[in-house]
């Protein structure tokens, strides 16, 4: 398969098409459409490549014909890029040829040939057991990944995992620590890596919790010399204490073979580096190594030594000078103690931290801008909290717990709630805000301020999608991460006391069943306000009855393609926020959804990677639901029924988010009957072509976000009748070529984002947008908006850097 359609060839072709769209005005729309269509093929091509199944001659011939079409397209883009933009005759000729190629590619896609090829692959694999180094990979995962796991830029979720360590930190950066104690370690590990090709294939970094192992590993993954040595073939993965080894192994195998000819071919000895962070056991490591692939080096990062001691770097604690410099960076934003401040106090606090980077950062942030008198109390608390056994890890725990004493109750509770989420996973900021809003009756902005405060204290990290550059448009673009030691502290503090009396009932890691401790104590009610359950597949028989009369937040994490909801939800009369997240590879079917009939107080519902249950006219309305988020879901026919009145089922809905739902074709017109809707966010839904014509009924709508809806070709003119609309995002809607002519009637519009659209002109009425304060556009469209800027006082026009990039795939 790789001989027929090469993944790197397709990647390069997409790059060239985007380059053409920027250079040649006449080819812009066609080139962008072609790039989107061809780019969307890549996950499917990779699935076929990795399957290891030999295609029939007939299928190979069909794919070879398509490959020839792509090759013609590549040659044409090269000609366009080399041609002069002033040669109009040649440009017209190129446009016609490109239109012809677009027709051929579209015909291929409409025929859904690749889907049939995948079906062939599945039939073959169903008849013979697929083995590769003792892996049993699920056959249906390929089909599910193909349709359901697309991310911005049409990337599959599997490949998107590679971005986990490439995010841009908003509040704190690990890079600030480098040069403070890590340079030596970086140099030593690089020496071992560069020699590894001669013998050792497994290199190690070990050290205690909070010593900076992950920071060092991240920096090595970004290091130019390391990337150059391995030809930019570097993969960083976090394994964690309860890993999905099958999924991780499939991901590593895909990475190792993506540069080669295919599964069954002989692989040349090109260098590749796989960095495995937070590995807990040798058994896990053994299952994630591919010793039979030449040129592969594995760098394992763990608390214990899992590699030979000769090629393991033990992360050293910081000496007094290094520790003082890191501490001062955290508290004073400089490496030295400021003149006039007590050197003695700084020395005492640094001494209590015993050279531990995490302690120095967290404690330093807690003392920022505090008077010296406060520092004296901090020294006393740190000294008092030091545990008797003097182990480094328990000392870190005690020191962090001491800093939490100074947090106000809501901020401290927010920190403790983070223990409800799985280890080493990015937490969508939207989810965390929803939980805090319901627990403490906060406004969204106030909840966000609490989270930022924790970030300023180095108790969590805010990260945003790297493909947005320095700008972001909503909470959905931002995620929360937390050091595993900090999460352990949150769990430890939450699990004090008898299980029935805990305010937070949490499972520390994924288990096959509910904790035995819960079952032994289920003869009396639980007082928990927050309940978090993390399992695999659950059937009706796996649940036992629980009384949770005070529970306001329920978070269900699982990894399976089917899942029976816990029956005790029906008795949770105070439940206001429900989060259901499937971490598996394919959307799950939920069973016993009828329990929702008793959730009268539910205000926030987050569904991720599940099949949305079918709604009908008999569905019991969720009278108080304010926020509904459908992420990576299969909509199926849930919203397509003409007789279904969505407004009756969700009468008070104010915030609707639908993201990465690739089978969403349209929004039902009855959704416009929800007069309380304040925000609609439809993002990364490539098949939706139009919006309801009766949008003007949404009198409360302030935010309309339509990011990366590639087939959306127009905005309804009714949008001009929305009396409160403030923000419109149509970025990466590549088929959208114009704004409504009467857009100037939206007097309340304050911000519009048009990045990577195909706008060739803007209506004259735009100058009437007197409230417009911010426009984000491409550099090529800057001249159009600068004319508007002269007519609209106070308008700021910002040209965004291109977010389209494939460099992050190598991270």
UniProtKB/Swiss-Prot annotation:
PANTHER family: DISEASE RESISTANCE PROTEIN ADR1 (PTHR36766:SF25), PLANT BROAD-SPECTRUM MILDEW RESISTANCE PROTEIN RPW8 (PTHR36766)
Gene Ontology biological process terms from the UniProt entry: cell surface receptor signaling pathway; defense response to bacterium
Listed SMART domains: AAA (SM00382)
Membrane-spanning ranges: none
Swiss-Prot/TrEMBL keywords: ATP-binding, Leucine-rich repeat, Nucleotide-binding, Plant defense, Repeat
Molecular function in Gene Ontology: ADP binding; ATP binding; ATP hydrolysis activity
Domain NB-ARC: 180-242, 312-437
Full protein name: Probable disease resistance protein At5g04720
Recorded family membership: Belongs to the disease resistance NB-LRR family.
Role summary: Probable disease resistance protein.
Binding site for ATP: 207-214
Keyword ATP-binding assigned: yes
Domain notes: The LRR repeats probably act as specificity determinant of pathogen recognition.
Boundaries of every RPW8 domain copy: 1-147
Presence of the UniProt keyword ATP-binding in the record: yes
């Amino acid at each position: 398969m790789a001989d027929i359609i090469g993944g790197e060839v397709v990647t390069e072709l997409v790059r060239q098409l985007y380059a053409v769209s920027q250079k040649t005005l006449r080819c812009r729309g066609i080139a962008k459409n072609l790039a989107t269509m061809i780019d969307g093929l890549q996950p499917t091509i990779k699935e076929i490549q990795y399957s290891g199944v030999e295609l029939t001659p007939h299928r190979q011939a069909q794919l070879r014909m398509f490959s020839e079409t792509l090759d013609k397209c590549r040659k044409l883009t090269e000609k366009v890029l080399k041609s002069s933009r002033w040669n109009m005759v040649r440009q017209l000729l190129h446009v016609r040829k490109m239109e012809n190629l677009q027709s051929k590619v579209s015909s291929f896609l409409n025929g859904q040939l690749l889907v049939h090829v995948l079906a062939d692959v599945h039939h073959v694999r169903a008849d013979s057991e697929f083995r590769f180094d003792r892996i049993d990979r699920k056959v249906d995962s390929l089909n599910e990944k193909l349709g359901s796991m697309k991310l911005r830029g049409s990337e599959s979720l599997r490949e998107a995992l590679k971005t986990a360590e490439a995010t841009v930190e908003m509040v704190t950066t690990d890079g600030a620590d480098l040069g403070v104690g890590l340079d030596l370690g970086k140099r030593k590990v690089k020496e071992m890596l560069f020699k590894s090709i001669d013998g050792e294939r497994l290199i190690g970094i070990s050290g205690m919790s909070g010593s900076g192992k992950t920071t060092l590993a991240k920096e090595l993954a970004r290091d130019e010399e390391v990337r150059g040595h391995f030809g930019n073939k570097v993969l960083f993965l976090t394994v964690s204490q309860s890993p999905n080894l099958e999924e991780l192994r499939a991901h590593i195998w895909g990475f190792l073979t993506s540069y080669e000819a295919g599964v069954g071919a002989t692989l040349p000895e090109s260098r590749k580096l796989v960095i495995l962070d937070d590995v807990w056991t040798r058994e896990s490591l053994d299952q994630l190594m591919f010793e039979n692939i030449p040129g592969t080096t594995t760098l394992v990062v763990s608390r214990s030594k899992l590699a030979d001691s000769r090629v393991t770097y033990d992360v050293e604690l910081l000496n007094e000078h290094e520790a003082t410099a890191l501490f001062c960076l955290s508290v004073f934003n400089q490496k030295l103690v400021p003149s006039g401040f007590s050197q003695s106090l700084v020395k005492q606090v640094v001494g209590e931290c015993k050279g531990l980077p995490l302690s120095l950062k967290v404690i330093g942030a807690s003392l920022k801008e505090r008077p010296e008198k406060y520092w004296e109390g901090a020294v006393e608390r740190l000294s008092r909290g030091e545990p008797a056994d003097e182990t480094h890890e328990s000392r870190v725990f005690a020191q962090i717990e001491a800093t939490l004493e100074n947090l106000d109750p809501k901020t401290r509770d927010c920190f403790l709630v983070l223990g409800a989420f799985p280890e080493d996973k990015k937490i969508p900021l939207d989810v965390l805000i929803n939980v805090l809003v319901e627990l403490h009756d906060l406004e969204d902005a106030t909840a966000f301020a609490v989270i930022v405060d924790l970030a300023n204290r180095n108790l969590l990290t805010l990260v945003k999608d790297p493909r947005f550059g320095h700008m972001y448009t909503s909470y959905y673009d931002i995620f929360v991460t937390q050091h595993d030691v900090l999460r352990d502290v949150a769990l430890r503090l939450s699990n004090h006391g008898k299980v029935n009396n805990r305010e937070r009932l949490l499972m520390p890691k994924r288990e096959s069943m509910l904790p035995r401790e819960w079952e032994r104590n289920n003869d009396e009610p639980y007082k928990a306000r927050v309940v978090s359950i993390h399992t695999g597949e659950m059937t009706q028989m796996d649940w036992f009855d629980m009384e949770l009369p005070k529970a306001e937040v329920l978070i269900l994490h699982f990894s399976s393609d089917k899942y029976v909801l816990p029956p005790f939800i029906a008795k949770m009369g105070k439940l206001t926020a429900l989060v259901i997240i499937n971490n598996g590879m394919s959307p799950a079917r939920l069973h016993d959804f009828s329990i929702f009939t008793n959730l009268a107080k539910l205000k926030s519902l987050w569904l991720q990677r599940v099949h949305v249950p079918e709604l009908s006219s008999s569905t019991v309305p969720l009278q108080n639901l304010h926020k509904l988020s459908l992420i990576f879901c299969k909509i199926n026919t849930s919203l397509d029924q003409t007789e279904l009145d969505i407004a009756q089922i969700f009468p008070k809905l104010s915030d609707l988010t639908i993201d990465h739902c690739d089978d969403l074709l349209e929004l039902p017109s009855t959704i416009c009957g929800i007069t309380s809707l304040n925000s609609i966010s439809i993002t990364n839904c490539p098949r939706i072509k139009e919006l309801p014509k009766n949008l003007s009924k949404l009198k409360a709508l302030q935010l309309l976000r339509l990011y990366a809806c590639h087939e959306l070709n127009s905005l309804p003119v009714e949008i001009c009748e929305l009396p409160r609309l403030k923000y419109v995002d149509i970025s990466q809607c590549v088929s959208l070529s114009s704004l409504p002519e009467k857009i100037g009637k939206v007097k309340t519009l304050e911000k519009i984002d048009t990045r990577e659209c195909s706008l060739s002109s803007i209506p004259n009425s735009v100058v009437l947008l007197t409230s417009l304060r911010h426009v984000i556009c491409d550099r090529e469209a800057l001249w159009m908006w600068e004319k508007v800027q002269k007519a609209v006082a106070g308008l700021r026009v910002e040209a965004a850097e291109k977010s389209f990039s494939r460099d992050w795939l190598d991270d």
